[in-house]
């Protein structure tokens, strides 16, 4: 058995996979069982009682994590020259228009988030098939298609994340690093879950919030009690 497999098995032995823990206890469990030598990302997975095959049950949105993600987020702003300086001053890592569309057509996607102004979306549509599957296509609903590029860049850099339910009814999101103070992790996780609950579709029937699990990179999942998050 590899060392990674052995570590995972040892970590699993410390967690009752059937038990739901209070959030604070679940966070401490994740910290305890994380054995990676790097600062692992903490992820939240939420199981929802929705059928994403129906458009009126698709849950998607954004949330500003109060304590950030702990990750350095690289941002490309696709805009015309009149917005370029504003984007650079706000901290965008890459700024351009047709030159970056050409780079993307040639296979470049080495960026975490793309922000675009509405007047370039027609041209950016040329690379939608490349960006879409990677979750990089700008979207007005997530605030990444806007004339206020400075605000969009600053929010993304500060910890704004985008989420969307998958075909199985699950939502996954990174909410910080294992090195974060436990209270800060709890604040990020609570903000994320509350926003998902707020976005409950009116068409969703039965129990909406069906399960919450937190984990770190390469660690087993730890279940979290749902009662405090159910309206």
Swiss-Prot record:
Single GO cellular component annotation?
large ribosomal subunit
Q: What UniProt keywords apply to this chain's record, in alphabetical order?
A: Repressor, Ribonucleoprotein, Ribosomal protein, RNA-binding, rRNA-binding, Translation regulation, tRNA-binding
Please verify whether the record's keywords include Ribonucleoprotein: yes
Q: Which GO terms describe its molecular function?
A: rRNA binding; structural constituent of ribosome; tRNA binding
Q: Which SUPFAM superfamilies match?
A: Ribosomal protein L1 (SSF56808)
Any keyword tRNA-binding? yes
Q: Which residues form the signal peptide?
A: none
Q: Which Pfam families match?
A: Ribosomal_L1 (PF00687)
Report the superkingdom from the record.
Answer: Bacteria
PROSITE patterns according to UniProt:
RIBOSOMAL_L1
GO BP: any one term: translation
Q: Which Gene3D superfamilies match?
A: 3.30.190.20, 3.40.50.790
- HAMAP family (alphabetical): Ribosomal_uL1_B
- State whether it acts alone or in a complex, and with which partners, per the record: Part of the 50S ribosomal subunit.
Function summary? Binds directly to 23S rRNA. The L1 stalk is quite mobile in the ribosome, and is involved in E site tRNA release.
Give the record's family classification. Answer: Belongs to the universal ribosomal protein uL1 family.
What protein name applies here?
A: Large ribosomal subunit protein uL1
Q: Which organism is it from?
A: Chlorobaculum tepidum (strain ATCC 49652 / DSM 12025 / NBRC 103806 / TLS) (Chlorobium tepidum)
**Gene this chain is encoded by:** rplA
